[in-house]
Amino acid sequence: MRRVVITGTGMVSPLGCGTEVSWARLLTGDNAARKVTEFEVEDLPAKIACRIPFGDGSDGTFNADDWMEPKEQRKVDPFIVYAMAAADMALADAGWKPESDEDQISTGVLIGSGIGGLEGIVDAGYTLRDKGPRRISPFFIPGRLINLAAGQVSIRHKLRGPNHSVVTACSTGAHAIGDASRLIALGDADVMVAGGTESPICRISLAGFAACKALSTQHNDNPEKASRPYDADRDGFVMGEGAGIVVLEELEHARARGAKIYAEVIGYGLSGDAFHITAPSEDGEGAYRCMQMALKRAGVTAADIDYINAHGTSTMADTIELGAVERLVGDSASRISMSSTKSAIGHLLGAAGAVEAIFSALAIRDNIAPPTLNLDNPSVETKIDLVPHVARKREINVALSNSFGFGGTNASLILRRYTGH
């Protein structure tokens, strides 16, 4: 099958607008968790989140007007705006602007979201109740449908190849990249714009995830300490928002136009737990099989893995994932670094896997493992380096990125340094 590489990245994250800004702040140990002030939270169990830094567009802040006209913004949910911004960045970074029929038809889009326009749906419900059906906007449906993130990107950039979307909870971003890679490998496209996007931070979302016992509620007075994967004092994840988009390209297509290459996508695994609607299987079997499949597809062994970007949500599932990883890597555990970047940016739900895949590609590029913040008191002993507190310089040629979601849906991506052959 054809080989697939990453030639462009774009990101809107709680650490900033832009891949390099977010990456630099991640490596220096910045933490995006804050008390929510944009709406009332005093009656909510979870009062904190990792919000995008909004501003005038300078110093890494996000200004939606830079990416979409205000009139158009009012027609869509923010998750679509974030996707548009990240896709614009990724395509510009890749230097890919298809203009011929051939190039447009061979370029597709696959962008997913875990929740989509949740707040917009709630608001429309109030409008219907209080003002009647005639006050519902004609843009209500197309502004909230999850596949419209891909649709809007496709329309803006005239990308006429596969136009697809996935919805697999917190595995969405990883599944989008994995599925898009397969479309290229199978010859259905030469280039794919792929990733995940999410704008979930609103009252009903915080209330709902807290009701599932998924969110941190014990660190409302000290938000930066709330997301603490693998730590004994963890009590749930901190919700985040944003988008991560990559440009995936068939290797020879990228080489022919002299594109820079971040990494090669060599493995993709997916599995189901068939266990519980929110909890992972306690033996980690689904996660293990998912990673094992990715290794098989990649044609590498566990001993080849240098860095793992863990799903690591700061929940009870952390130790289950760690156990599955230890089972996978066996005697190679002591040479592997594994960190959870959710400790800095929170859990971006459907965007998480895509943002973390980008971080994994950058870890390969720069030979550095980003840190796991707040790992003060590890809950279990392991030979794996969990990269506590401070980023670690080390050789990284192969990286594994894990994403696991509600409903027992699992995805693993394996990236490798591209060396020119």
UniProtKB/Swiss-Prot annotation:
Reactions catalysed, as given in the entry: a fatty acyl-[ACP] + malonyl-[ACP] + H(+) = a 3-oxoacyl-[ACP] + holo-[ACP] + CO2; (9Z)-hexadecenoyl-[ACP] + malonyl-[ACP] + H(+) = 3-oxo-(11Z)-octadecenoyl-[ACP] + holo-[ACP] + CO2
Q: Which Gene3D superfamilies match?
A: 3.40.47.10
Q: Does the keyword Lipid metabolism apply?
A: yes
Q: Where is the Ketosynthase family 3 (KS3) domain?
A: 1-417
One GO biological process term: fatty acid biosynthetic process
Q: In which pathway does it act?
A: Lipid metabolism; fatty acid biosynthesis
What InterPro entries has UniProt attached to this entry?
3-oxoacyl-ACP_synth-2 (IPR017568), Beta-ketoacyl_synthase (IPR000794), Ketoacyl_synth_AS (IPR018201), Ketoacyl_synth_C (IPR014031), Ketoacyl_synth_N (IPR014030), PKS_Beta-ketoAc_synthase_dom (IPR020841), Thiolase-like (IPR016039)
Active site (catalytic residues):
170 (for beta-ketoacyl synthase activity), 311 (for beta-ketoacyl synthase activity), 347 (for beta-ketoacyl synthase activity)
Q: Name one Pfam family in it.
A: Ketoacyl-synt_C
Q: Which GO terms describe its molecular function?
A: 3-oxoacyl-[acyl-carrier-protein] synthase activity
**Where on the tree of life does the source sit, at the highest rank?**
Bacteria
Keyword annotations for this protein? Acyltransferase, Fatty acid biosynthesis, Fatty acid metabolism, Lipid biosynthesis, Lipid metabolism, Transferase
EC numbers listed for it are: 2.3.1.179
Q: What does this protein do?
A: Involved in the type II fatty acid elongation cycle. Catalyzes the elongation of a wide range of acyl-ACP by the addition of two carbons from malonyl-ACP to an acyl acceptor. Can efficiently catalyze the conversion of palmitoleoyl-ACP (cis-hexadec-9-enoyl-ACP) to cis-vaccenoyl-ACP (cis-octadec-11-enoyl-ACP), an essential step in the thermal regulation of fatty acid composition.
Family the entry assigns:
Belongs to the thiolase-like superfamily. Beta-ketoacyl-ACP synthases family.
Q: How does it assemble?
A: Homodimer.
Stated name of the protein: 3-oxoacyl-[acyl-carrier-protein] synthase 2
